[in-house]
């Protein structure tokens, strides 16, 4: 059996989703929609057999739709998710769940009350790297986990491949704290459980419409201190890493998927041999989505987990 997906939002994430769905044996693309005609035209050129003319509301209500993927900017997530709930359709939503915390709390309650399969797209919900960290923690491999450090730097924000998504540069719903840090706070939530925000400091440019340039924070989860340092601007390679420090062994993830460990000496790479990490991660996620739709155990974060992350993110940005 294959599952038919309505893809809402045809930007970078929507295009990636289309490409991966097209290659997975358990999914068919029912149709896609974007409010920007140029985005629809671009998608048509890449996937000429797919319907990109049927509006989002009709795709959601269609009796042929088995899953609604929501890849539009964050402030539009709730509207599409609520429409999917009304139509009785399972949902995969991009992160962050939203920007307004009160709205996201109400949405989460509606989603939970519906009993529908639901998930939010955090990178470490199904990736090999996230699984490795959780396994190390559950098995006691760290000894005592004494701290977590999250470090991120972007020479340019938004990143060049995101340049067309102008909203990512704006304070209203963009910024690297929402877009990138949220993945790593989710991983902390997955491994350690809910965190509390102890302190934070965020710097913005002179233009009040633009997103943050620097953000630091301290949090605590399961008694473990978590430190965050994120910034943008300044030449050099981008930095994206999270380190879990233990008394017996420490682990870190760099560049999203590369894993390393140390017992006191130099870092030793433990990254598994995979031909294409992006495709591997996408297929692992799609396999988990199949399990979710079929009511089987899966590792994907639900709206409640995404809400916990959003509450932290918006508190940092407050």
Where are the regions that the model predicts?
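C-terminal helix-rich "cap/oligomerization" subdomain common to oxidoreductases
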Residues: 1, 26, 67-69, 288-318
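N-terminal Rossmann-like dinucleotide-binding module
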Residues: 1-47
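Contiguous beta-strand/loop segments that form the cofactor/metal-binding neighborhood of enzyme cores
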Residues: 179-180, 185-257, 286-295
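Short, conserved SAM-binding/catalytic segment
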Residues: 42-50, 110-114
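Predominantly a Rossmann-like dinucleotide-binding segment in NAD(P)-dependent oxidoreductases
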Residues: 124-199, 205-208
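Beta-strand-loop-alpha-helix segment that lines the small-molecule cofactor/substrate pocket
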Residues: 66-67, 73-74, 78-125
């Amino acid at each position: 059996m294959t599952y038919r997906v309505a893809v809402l939002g045809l930007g970078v994430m929507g295009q990636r989703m289309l490409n991966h769905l097209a290659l997975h044996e358990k999914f068919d693309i029912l149709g896609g929609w974007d409010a920007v005609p140029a985005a629809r035209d671009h998608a048509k050129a890449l996937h000429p057999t797919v319907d990109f003319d049927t509006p989002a509301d009709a795709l959601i209500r269609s009796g042929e739709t088995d899953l609604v993927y929501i890849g539009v900017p964050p402030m539009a997530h709730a509207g599409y998710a609520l429409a999917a709930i009304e139509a009785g359709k399972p949902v995969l939503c991009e992160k962050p769940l939203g920007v307004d915390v009160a709205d996201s709390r109400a949405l989460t309650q509606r989603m939970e009350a519906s009993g529908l399969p639901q998930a939010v797209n955090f990178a470490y919900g199904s990736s090999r790297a996230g699984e490795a960290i959780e396994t190390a923690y559950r098995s006691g491999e760290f000894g005592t986990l004494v701290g977590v450090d999250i470090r991120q730097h972007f020479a340019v924000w938004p990143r060049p491949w995101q340049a067309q998504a102008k909203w990512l540069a704006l304070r209203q719903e963009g910024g690297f704290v929402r877009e990138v840090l949220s993945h790593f706070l989710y991983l902390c939530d997955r491994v350690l459980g809910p965190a509390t925000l102890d302190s934070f400091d965020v710097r913005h440019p002179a233009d009040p419409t633009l997103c943050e340039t620097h953000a630091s924070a301290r949090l605590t989860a399961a008694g473990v201190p978590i430190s965050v340092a994120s910034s943008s601007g300044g030449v050099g390679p981008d930095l994206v890493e999270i380190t879990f420090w233990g008394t017996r062994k420490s682990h870190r993830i760099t560049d999203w998927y590369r894993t390393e460990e140390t017992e006191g000496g130099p870092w030793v790479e433990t990254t598994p041999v995979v031909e294409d990490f992006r495709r591997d991660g996408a297929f692992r996620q799609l396999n988990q989505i199949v399990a979710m739709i079929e009511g089987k155990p899966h590792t994907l974060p639900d709206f409640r987990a995404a809400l916990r992350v959003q509450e932290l993110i918006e508190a940092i940005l407050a």
